[in-house]
Amino acid sequence: MQPDFKKIHSFENNLINKRSLKDLMYQAFLNYGIVKSSIIADRVKNLTFHFATQSGVSLSVEDLRVPAKKRELIGLTRNEVETTQKRYEIGSITSVEKFQKTIDIWNNANNFLKDDVLTYFRESDPLNPLYIMAFSGARGNISQVRQLVGMRGLMSNPQGQIIDLPIKSNFREGLTVTEYIISSYGARKGLVDTALRTADSGYLTRRLVDVAQDIIVRESDCGTTEGLWATELASNNFLNLRGRLLAEPIFTQEGNLFAPANTEITETFLQTLKTLKDHSPIKVRSSLTCTSTRSVCQNCYGWHLSHSKLVDLGEAVGIVAAQSIGEPGTQLTMRTFHTGGVFSGDLTRQVRSPMEGKIEYWEGHKASLFRTMHGKMGFRLKEEVNLIIKNSFGTTISFEIPAESLLLVNTDQYVYENEIIAEIQKDTNLILEEEQKEIYSETSGEVFFNALDVKVQADKQGNTYKTNNKAGLIWILQGSFYELPAFSETLLKPGLNLSKNTLLSRTPLYNKYPGWVQIDKSDNGTGICVQNFSVTLTNAFINEKVENSSRLQIKTDNQDFQFQLTTEPNSVLKQGDTIAVLDDNTYRTTTGGIVTYSLENPQASKKRKSVKNLFKGYFYWIPEETFKFSTLDEVRLSFSKNESIVGVGEEIMPNTFSKVGGFFQIKEAEQEVTIKPGELFELTSAESQIFDKSDRFVKPGNFIVPGKIITQQLVYLEFFELNEKQYILARPVQVFEVPKEEDLSLSQSFFPYNSHEHIKLKVIKRVFYKNWEKIISNNGINLLQTFIVFDFKQEQQGLEPRLEFTPSKVPGKSFLKIALYEVIKTFENNRKSSHSSLPTTTRNFVSNKQYVASNTLIGQIETTAGLVNKLAAINPHLNSGNMKEVLILNPSDLKKVFCPNVELLKKVSVGDLVRIGTLLNDNVKSPYSGQILEIFEDHILIRLSQPYLISAGTILHATSNNLVKAGDILATLVYETIKTTDIVQGLPKVEELLEARKVLHNALLAPCPGYAYVRFNKHGESTVQLIGLDNEVQTLALKPGIKTKFNSGDFVEVSSALTDGLISPHTKLETLFSYFKNRYTSFEACKLSFKLLQLFLIGEIQRTYRSQGVDIADKHVELIVKQMTSKVCIEDSGTTTFLPGEVLNFQKMADIALVAENKGEIPPSYVPLLLGITKASLNSDSFISAASFQETTRVLTEAAIEGRKDWLTGLKENVIIGRLIPAGTGFNYLENQERLAREKGEIDATFHREAKPLSENILDLRLVKKE
């Protein structure tokens, strides 16, 4: 290969780093070809390995040198952060600006530290192993070195937002616990990204291969004269023309031919072209404009990039393009992992003053006033500005500030060395998203709006909210926040001085029900109750504290019943509560067993605490002992007794003895031992034949064994087999009778006498076991228990039942009484808020045991100030039904500022709001932010206040003159932020573009080129007025809150974005076609629309990759985008047989339309269609390829119904069928086959023309063929 451009190399004694090595290999490859380059690479490898082995480089802890300047730099940075905090506290910047400024301060500190690390290594320790390793390209990078010996820096949280607490330590010094926790965010994110996104990248590659696999270089020249201008290329870089062919000749300024069409653009060509002063525009051939059918030609594709010469015929360039775009996705995934999730804010480049001096520039430049992200005011430049700095020695420095930059200085302003004078935005197409940040009040106080323009707006649901349309301040005038009791009456007005016992408010207390007053005094305050109703048991006495519990004795005519109380006196009762349980062992068993019963009240047998009447019936108890064991060793001694009869008192397990004796069984599966009392009878074989073997009861006098054994008592028969013999166990049954006891009744005395319907005490009996339930117990159980329960039907709200003991005439005995009380809520026992800490007392207007009618004023709650202070405000927006809010000024909320002769030189008045640094008189600045409360002869009294700066567009939650607590939301700042360009945005963004997905919140696009203006109607609604080149006026509605991307009067191109938001490619295509179809034919309009959309998509995809530091040749992206924009959809079939909605290839459609026109028929009308890579694959001409990708059944079914043919033109369908693929060597083979077929076809055609006169029908023709 002849070299096109040789760089003259001479001996250089320099350090070769990664970049130099890359440049060396690039030059070798460019000038000497693949073979020689590989030899050079091999020799370089051997050389470096040899010396690396000899040097024995090893990394130790001592090699990690932390720069000495680090401590000083961290100190300076902290001071700068503190200054920013002070600016925020005086209301000069918003919380968002403070956050952004803090992040930028730490980011700049990090970058300075990184430079220090590099300077130290380069100048003081160039042979440091860490430095050699990172900068030779062996392992690691500058970011990792910075984290090792500089500082770890700022981290992002899982939501992608930056944490404003930087990690100041490095890995050499070690992280603190807090830093370690924050640090782990990024590390985890990197690991998760690596795992998840690799799968996404692989799937993206598969889809790309599927859409482009049939693009093969099939011919040398398609013969097109079309191409792309150099300015239209996505990279827009002069060097990226290399490897393409000229579509049009280039002429010099004099009109001489410099290069003819189809000239290859090489390095030499470009170097020579640079020497020309002026030349005609460069137009190059591109895959986008190639007219080859289902392929691309050599001249339009250009060089094969791996060996810098024209691509060969048969090259599968589609596969190469798909892999070139898909493979970097895997690299992008790892991007976060390499930097450990560390944030790097390289979005703007700061221009600093190179020296001290005065700034000069022409003031007539177009610019708009702009507030930076840090809260500084500056100018957004619309055009380039020439900046000049002059110092006192006459030295002048001038430099250019490009358009769209931020200028932060005025003309004639004096600047210092290293002062930031401008910010240049690196990428004008950054991803902006709207964010919200809530502002919380740091103190309690009164809200005051200063210079805000409040407007009420409504959302789509009709909910109203307040917004601020102008930057201003929200002041919180400090004070202590208190809540007064509900329905309280405020006695004072704001501004009054308060003493310790000044009465602030009073709350009247009324009773709802009549009754007797009961006043309880405790540590929690005074409680007032009104007894409305009571019931007393007159035939029941309480013996207090008998055997550590209270006993209830109920006397009837026949006997006394003893109950044990289960409820403590003075306790509050609920419906169904148990008051007492009867001491009765009548229904108690000695062991466990099986219970069954026959009762007249079956509902009472259910296990629930319901109030039921007394019932009668019988319990049948079959006793049985059950013992649980954990290991077989515990029952090993009893194995010999298994399945035999044991006696009473016999030892079953260690220290465990049988109480009843009986049939002994060991059940290993259940880990239990059972002893069933009863007699065991063996059955003969004859008896077992006629015996009813079901378990059952046998009444006294009946046979147990027919004709043999009669029982004298009720028994329960159980049948079982033992050692192949059959036995009956007759188990004794205990019968417990439940008589209907009518003598146990409660004599109840009610007061008032007419109100006894809704409260009662009832005697009920409860069974707690289900019928036929087996109960495991060694100590016995109560089958039936008698209870006294509380029955309460609450018809009147607000009454509380309580159990009480009423003294009787007999000493040591009391009556049982239940009383209903209305509890009057006082403020002491109703305190729900932590802010209600003002002293309160309850004043009673009634005495104990006094009878009161309903709605009587029985007392009031009084709230006092508690300290010597001042009442500042009462919340005016609360009605009397809610808790009232007051603000009280304590001495700590007021500050004195001494000012001599203040009246003579004062610059402030009472009521003024001042910030820190405001002049109070000619000599004294205010050390506090606040409100001037009073001015005295020698001092000023300031009420401390906190100002919050609010930007335009902020949503307001607080109202002026309202009171707020510390932590209440005041407002929500709405601002724009730049998304961190991490892979989480990168790879999905590429996928979104390639899949041509619909975009939410898309930008408004210009329907035609023209001059754009923003107009407002009388309702305040904004519209965009577009005056086209033909003076046609179009009006476009703007949604509320949407920002425009142009200034009124700017010229906008067709389909350019007029508002903020993402551009939807589908909307862009529709806009372009609707504009062009009125000016050109359908074919031309479609072609133009596709071309502009293709350039847009290529630009967007390339921008996303380049923002991640990945470089892909434009020609690869062009091939994929061409596949996405090659289909049209038929709208009207004309006189053809096509159906509306049918999707066809654009070139095929153009040919059909041309034929229809030539024949005088109406051609079909169609619109351009943008397909994502998945849909483009499924709409492939080859149904075999489409079916092997996705939706196999649907694709094959449709192909069968339509009777489609697959011409096997691509690689995939040939692989599936098993044929030779038409690429590489297979391409030449198939070319030869086609050539032979063509030649044979020509011979056959000649023969047919001669054979035709012999016969007119096909049969004769076949006969002639056979001959």
Swiss-Prot record:
InterPro entries (alphabetical): DNA-dir_RpoC2_beta_pp, DNA-dir_RpoC_beta_prime, RNA_pol_Rpb1_3_sf, RNA_pol_Rpb1_4, RNA_pol_Rpb1_5, Rpb1_funnel_sf
GO molecular function, one term: zinc ion binding
Keyword S-adenosyl-L-methionine: no
Catalytic activity: RNA(n) + a ribonucleoside 5'-triphosphate = RNA(n+1) + diphosphate
GO biological process: DNA-templated transcription
Enzyme class label: transferase
Required cofactor names: Zn(2+)
Zinc listed as a keyword: yes
Subcellular location: Plastid, Chloroplast
Stored CDD domains: RNAP_beta'_C
Subunit structure comment from the entry: In plastids the minimal PEP RNA polymerase catalytic core is composed of four subunits: alpha, beta, beta', and beta''. When a (nuclear-encoded) sigma factor is associated with the core the holoenzyme is formed, which can initiate transcription.
Role: DNA-dependent RNA polymerase catalyzes the transcription of DNA into RNA using the four ribonucleoside triphosphates as substrates.
NCBIfam families: rpoC2_cyan
Name under which the protein is recorded: DNA-directed RNA polymerase subunit beta''
Source organism of this protein record: Emiliania huxleyi
